[in-house]
Each structure stands twice: as structure tokens, then as C-alpha cells.
């Protein structure tokens, strides 16, 4: 240890210098440990990337899917505006179009209506997912029709709207999927 004693007005500065040396040594040690940890993490990441680790393959696939979905946002915006204009034209003079009805899609019924604000198709939602699709057992199925009416009476406070709302909540808009009730309704009318 470097010991130099400096006395000023009867004060001994040797103690302060010894503490400073300990502090400098601690700073050197912590800096060395930090760089060794960073080097180890970098080497580990390099090994993961060069060894075709499935974790990075999944992350790459997820990033591709996320970027693709973000690209769909502009398409969904355009389609939502078109469908809203179409709904506005359909609703001209028809107030009953804003009330829930059981719409027959062939293999299933869906309780749906047009939204009064956006003029987009709205259906009664099953929990936190997509719309209730009441499957039919035959071409004419009174029990499926009856259950659809039950949904209108008791579950009509939980709805999902085609377009941007559906894209934000479920990850798809319903317009670009086939078969889906949003795209099927667009093709039916």
C-alpha cells in the first residue's frame, strides 16, 4: 500500500488516501466483472444464433407474423370504411336493421345487427372470443333458431363488431377469412 502522510494543520491525510485506494480497487474490480458478464452474455447469444436454436426460430417467426398483421391494419381500415359506407346505405330508412335478428348462414345461425354508430355488422359474442355460431342439425332446425332467440334476449350486452374492433381484440378482422360470418355477410347481401 502506498503510504504518504500529509499533515496540514495537524490533520493526518493518510486515512483518506487509504480509503480512496480501496474505492479505486473496488471500481476496477466491478468494471472488470461487468465486462466479463457482458462478454459471457454476448458469447451465449452468439452461440444461440449460430446453433439454430428453436427459441430464436420461434421469435423470428413471431416477428414475421407481427409485421404481417401490422401490414393488414391499413387493409382493414380501408375495408372497414367501405363496409361502414355499405352499412349506411343498407340502413337508409330501415330502423329494424339495428335490432338483433337470427341470420341463417346455411350451416349455422348468428344473432346479429348493424351497429348504430359505425354501421358495421355486430354479433353477440361468445365470452371473449368471436360470435356465437349456433350450428344447425338439419336444413330447418327450430331448436337452433330457438337458442339463437334466447341469445338475443339474454346475451345481447356482449357484442363484437367486424373490422378494426375485431382486429384489435381477436387479431383478425373477419373480412379476409373464409368462411367467416363477416365476409359471408358481405357476400350474401
Curated annotation (Swiss-Prot):
UniProt keyword Transmembrane helix present: yes
Keywords: Disulfide bond, Fusion of virus membrane with host cell membrane, Fusion of virus membrane with host membrane, Host endoplasmic reticulum, Host membrane, Late protein, Membrane, Signal-anchor, Transmembrane, Transmembrane helix, Viral envelope protein, Viral penetration into host cytoplasm, Virion, Virus entry into host cell
Intravirion-side segments: 1-28
PTM entry text: Contains two intramolecular disulfide bonds. They are created by the viral disulfide bond formation pathway, a poxvirus-specific pathway that operates on the cytoplasmic side of the MV membranes.
TM helices/strands, residue ranges: 29-49
Segments on the Virion surface face: 50-189
Keyword Translocase attributed: no
Record GO cellular component, one term: viral envelope
Membrane protein topology class: Single-pass type III membrane protein
InterPro entries the UniProt entry points to: Pox_LP_H2 (IPR005023)
GO BP terms, alphabetized: fusion of virus membrane with host plasma membrane; symbiont entry into host cell
Disulfide feature: none
Annotated compartments: Virion membrane; Host endoplasmic reticulum membrane
Subunit structure: Part of a stable entry-fusion complex (EFC) which is at least composed of proteins OPG143, OPG147, OPG155, OPG86, OPG94, OPG107, OPG104, and OPG099. Formation of the viral membrane is necessary for the assembly of the complex.
Family: Belongs to the orthopoxvirus OPG107 family.
Function, as annotated: Envelope protein part of the entry-fusion complex responsible for the virus membrane fusion with host cell membrane during virus entry. Also plays a role in cell-cell fusion (syncytium formation).
Listed name of the protein: Late protein H2
Organism of derivation: Variola virus (isolate Human/India/Ind3/1967)
